[in-house]
């Protein structure tokens, strides 16, 4: 590649941006900018490996290794910018403890539950797995096997895994770690609109007059999108930024209005805003009358705990998602109790501030963008909160037009594209279909060439239930891919670790590194990372992006896709299907599950010649695997509002936002003129619902399952920091990021620290009924909790803070609440 003046300017711009951000570029990147080595580096595009923003990066490879990355200036998402994690993407694959071969617990030369991890071949690994799976299937049937996947799976990996589980093993016991982050958003979308994923797009950032962050610290969790809000705010003086949270963080630095509310009281605030809109005649009646219906949610629905838990037994309508049609007058009556006085009393937010927030929503001339992520979704009433925010936008008609957008942000690179769109949840199928719907199962069975009745109608075990079933010995063979749930999930000591170490169970973990989850497993499989394989992700604005494999894997690591497909070869159809199904499909007798799933004339229809020379998976299987899987998967959504472009197109663009119809992407869904599925003359068409109308759903404030008391007198909130991503599996192996933030700390109000005779930097014990951890106290810095609350990030494997979290979930979405549980803090003597 010749070093043109344009390339030189771009390269130096990257260096300048890094310097401004306080970043020292890796030596390889510095050489790229300063020396003739530039000519030896090959560049290609790929979406970033981290969050759900979907930034595109340019990846520089040399001698079979990634040596540099930089922001992609052609990308509409990030326009050449990266966050600090993105600047160091080149180092995530090269940690010193990268796993390079399968490791099986062995003793005296054979597998043993309490044995030491011993290197084995892939054949030994898969033979051992298959032996365990076959024994479990024969003894207990399909519900005894399960899989826990990821919003970091590529589209093809998630699709292959879901197909293997639901069509091959006939088990719906597959769930992604997106259950912990996006499940409440999914259910909220489905209840209100009958279809999943945001109606808006990132272009809304340049059009909104007011931004409202509901429990989201975008400055650290979505920093590139935060730059777009910052630019809009600083270049347009009329724009206002509102930040609601249970503690102060970096997003407050830009906020015109900051609101610190009591945990769980966001429900009361949202209902107050709806009441304010009604009482101040700010309802957009033309929109409401034409495009909405009013419904009432069942209340007192419990907390997703075990059935014998006293809180669950006390609930009047445990786990009920029933909606009852009501009139506007009934809806008005339901929100009337949420006066500003009542909302202020519950939330702790001053009345004047609440009114200021409500006015911005009520003003017909103010375009409002509401944004949220884990603060709203990781909530025992997360689905309700999603719907209460939609209510506000629907009452005012501020939806699906530029700058008017209720926008759920995602935390993982393909939580949308893989977990949600592919349907790797225990209850879902691709394109918003569900296993409980006979018509949906019939569609899937037709596309997958399955006999009727193959896919079980009952949803499988969701993430938290998988832990309980492992613990109880109901789920016995379990495969974890592309996540670190032993560190990320709740209530580790009581529910998760006992299930992993249950002698009846066989646990397999596929990961590039020896995580806490891997170390609790029986078999560890080394996994290819990011651009060591070809794949596709789908980001928060419905943008699907693809990339080519650009380097070989480290050691004998294999992609999750390769592992799923290769494992499926170990099973004859007679070993996984009953005779009644084989009688309906005699062509599968004597065939392997691999033959049925992947050599079906669809997945294997694209010849190897169409793939690039560097495509390990395709060369192993003898056909263009990624294209075949993608095109079969895309069949589900085309013509049904989830249209994807042909696979090859995605390699020529920086992503496209579905539905893609006649070669054109969709920016705003449901809006006539923008969405090809919106009927002519409709204005708005919420076509996910049969009547084309969105639901305004009434739901009240309800208290959390646990609150502080005299013994456990502080709230604990867990979350992330800018420099690390989730459990730190990748970022803690990047020296620059590790040095920047080497340890998790307990952010605490100075007065709470003083009351416990604790000084900044001293070690304390945080404890509750579920366990305890040791951590240093921080009373200054970026996160400043109010009195009565502490914040501890969960990236640090030495401080497994999430073991203190109760495994309470939203009863509708089954998503865990990581944002509030009572603890006590004592100084270490």
UniProtKB/Swiss-Prot annotation:
State the compartments where it is located: Periplasm
Q: Which GO terms fall under molecular function for this chain's record?
A: 4 iron, 4 sulfur cluster binding; electron transfer activity; iron ion binding; molybdenum ion binding; molybdopterin cofactor binding; nitrate reductase (cytochrome) activity
Q: Could you say which EC number(s) this protein's record lists? A: 1.9.6.1
**Any Gene Ontology biological process:** Mo-molybdopterin cofactor biosynthetic process
Q: How is the cofactor bound?
A: Binds 1 [4Fe-4S] cluster.
Q: Which GO terms describe its cellular component?
A: membrane; nitrate reductase complex; periplasmic space
The catalytic activity, as recorded, is: 2 Fe(II)-[cytochrome] + nitrate + 2 H(+) = 2 Fe(III)-[cytochrome] + nitrite + H2O
Q: Which domain of life is it from?
A: Bacteria
Q: Which cofactor does it need?
A: [4Fe-4S] cluster; Mo-bis(molybdopterin guanine dinucleotide)
Family from the record: Belongs to the prokaryotic molybdopterin-containing oxidoreductase family. NasA/NapA/NarB subfamily.
What exactly does this protein do?
A: Catalytic subunit of the periplasmic nitrate reductase complex NapAB. Receives electrons from NapB and catalyzes the reduction of nitrate to nitrite.
Q: What is this protein called?
A: Periplasmic nitrate reductase
Protein source organism: Vibrio parahaemolyticus serotype O3:K6 (strain RIMD 2210633)
